[in-house]
């Protein structure tokens, strides 16, 4: 029969393993290599950086923001849970956030298990810090 401290160590090991797997999948999401993921930008983000007279500016802005999200390097301060699901960056002098959320495959509810791709679709949202 395991003791309380042994159970705590087991729970901690499971939590670390879950966080590592989430981090791995989130890295794939950020890099655009995860089929079960999509990236969206908020309306405020698009309005702040796109030229309404130039429809092609939307693609240029989306590409620039995605490149910054992909290039994000984590430090201990911005990844407290080890899942690499949130970041902060600047674009054209404005502070932005990106956040990965875990949904069920219908995108209606939260995922039961973010480490199981058969149960989880990721949505990476890019937004102005002021929209958070």
Q: Model-predicted segments: where are they?
A:
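Short, compact, well-ordered microdomains
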Residues: 83-132
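An acidic, glycine-rich, mixed-charge low-complexity segment common to nucleic-acid enzymes
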Residues: 1-2
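Compact soluble domain cores
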Residues: 10-90
């Amino acid at each position: 029969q395991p003791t309380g401290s042994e159970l705590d160590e087991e729970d901690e090991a499971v939590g670390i393993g879950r966080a590592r797997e989430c981090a791995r999948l989130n890295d794939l999401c950020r890099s655009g290599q995860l089929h079960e993921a999509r990236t969206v930008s908020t309306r405020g983000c698009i309005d702040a950086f796109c030229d309404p007279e130039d429809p092609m500016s939307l693609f240029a802005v989306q590409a620039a923001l995605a490149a910054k999200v992909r290039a994000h390097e984590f430090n201990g301060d911005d990844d407290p849970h080890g899942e690499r699901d949130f970041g902060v960056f600047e674009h054209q002098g404005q502070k932005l956030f990106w956040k990965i959320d875990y949904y069920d495959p219908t995108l209606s509810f939260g995922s039961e298990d973010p480490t199981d791709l058969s149960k989880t679709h990721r949505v990476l949202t890019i937004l102005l810090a002021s929209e958070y």
